[in-house]
Amino acid sequence: MGRRQARETALQVLFQIDLGKTEPDLALNNTAEEFGAGPQEIEFARQLVMGTLEHIEEIDAMIGKVSKEWQLNRMANVDRNIMRLAIFEMNYRADIPKSVSVNEALELSKIFGTPDSVRFINGILGKLLDNKDEAAPVISSLE
């Protein structure tokens, strides 16, 4: 299991938390066990989940600023959480290139989303990359 699988695990955990208000550690342990994740992958998935949850209000505000046509609560749960995960990486993980975060989000959307998910997620993430002022003050501090 590599970083992509760790991201898949993180997405599934965020999805469970979003739907069922499951405790993050319980959801992470159950999901990681189900997929046979190793210690490094579990740790990376944990960092992604906990970081996303820690900054979820800011991340949701970023999405809201660029998705004027769609309210966050009307977006598909999977799409919403793929974007949250990618935006966390883009803004709060300087060790991960933004292009990698976007590409990984698009790959996740191909696996877990609908046929329209890739285009929708790419559009939102692209707007955030193009409009750094719309995103967050954190972006400028990372560059």
Swiss-Prot record:
Recorded superkingdom: Bacteria
One GO term describing the cellular component: cytosol
CDD domains, alphabetized: Terminator_NusB
Any single Pfam family the record assigns to this protein: NusB
GO molecular function, one term: RNA binding
Keyword Transcription regulation among UniProt keywords: yes
Signal peptide residues on this chain, from the entry's feature table: none
Keywords: RNA-binding, Transcription, Transcription antitermination, Transcription regulation
UniProt KW Transcription regulation keyword: yes
InterPro entries: NusB-like_sf (IPR035926), NusB_fam (IPR011605), NusB_RsmB_TIM44 (IPR006027)
SUPFAM superfamilies reported for this sequence: NusB-like
Family: Belongs to the NusB family.
Function according to Swiss-Prot or TrEMBL: Involved in transcription antitermination. Required for transcription of ribosomal RNA (rRNA) genes. Binds specifically to the boxA antiterminator sequence of the ribosomal RNA (rrn) operons.
HAMAP family from the UniProt entry: NusB
PANTHER family: ANTITERMINATION NUSB DOMAIN-CONTAINING PROTEIN, N UTILIZATION SUBSTANCE PROTEIN B-RELATED
Name under which the protein is recorded: Transcription antitermination protein NusB
Lineage: Bacteria, Bacillati, Bacillota, Clostridia, Eubacteriales
